[in-house]
């Protein structure tokens, strides 16, 4: 069960966030409205929420998942692969230290890691080697996890930006998977819920204390999740999709 959530209000500079999509620029007013709805959804999940203020220097700073990995035993400050995002680690560290006094580790150069590439399954962490997370970063991450009695393994990505672009672990051995992840041997022991290609964006969901928060507008995925017995909460994240963001990106859950 999660007790705490850290999130950050989007900055107006969000409209200049990094993107590989061709969906246009986000509308800030809509993005703010969508973020407010996301926070309201989290408020129904029996968690304490720390909402940090916007920081205009960092357009992508609403995506708090990437600069930190929160585990049950330590927090790890990452080193984002996107240079424009590296300062995001500095503006969140004080908050992280408050929750993990004396238990904060960090990834050092030349390693790069963005925690959107990391999926937690119990005490094991799957780490995507991607354009943003390199082999050295993954090596350091696994060494830190093992130091704290946890474990990690590497999954090589072929097409998507981050590991969790196409995967979501919903506890109880249930794994949402889209695209390249459906057939990866690393995941064949899970109960794989295959997300159809046309709804692949919906593979990025979050489990929060027996609720599943997912992007709105993907009825087939919603039905598959609901059939497993979860309470499903839909939130519109269409403005964040324009800058390669999804449901998991906007919070730290621990």
Swiss-Prot record:
Its EC number is 3.5.3.18. InterPro entries: DDAH, DDAH-like. This is N(G),N(G)-dimethylarginine dimethylaminohydrolase. Belongs to the DDAH family. Zn(2+) binds at residues 162, 249. It is an enzyme of class 3 (hydrolase). Changing residue 114 to Q: Abolishes enzyme activity. Changing residue 249 to S: Abolishes enzyme activity. Coiled coil: none annotated. It comes from Pseudomonas aeruginosa (strain ATCC 15692 / DSM 22644 / CIP 104116 / JCM 14847 / LMG 12228 / 1C / PRS 101 / PAO1).
